[in-house]
């Protein structure tokens, strides 16, 4: 994962703002449309490691799929949560900017500046 990536949802205003910030800084990165392209569990685990957070911390709790899959169940394993995030990428908080050994969740969007 040497190339910089932005996990991007074009329908999300925060994600669009983060994209603009990175473009204005002339950053070289790949836009990964994670809702359209398959997100592998191994890639998601690397992102979690770079963020230094547990899978549960990356969940969007307001999504219908969160409630439908009982993700508020504290007994769900990290492995199961990662599996559900790959199956239902809408569950993943966004945007996420990944560069070198670091990653940040772009909330607020200016947080992407922390790792450039």
What do the predicted segments below correspond to?
Residues 22, 115-116:
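Alpha-helix C-terminal capping segments
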Residues 26:
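Short glycine-rich hinge loops at helix-strand junctions in the catalytic core
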Residues 1-21, 29-32:
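Local sequence-structure signature of Cys/Sec-based thiol-disulfide redox active-site neighborhoods
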Residues 36-115:
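Thiol/selenol-based redox catalytic cores and closely related redox-interacting motifs
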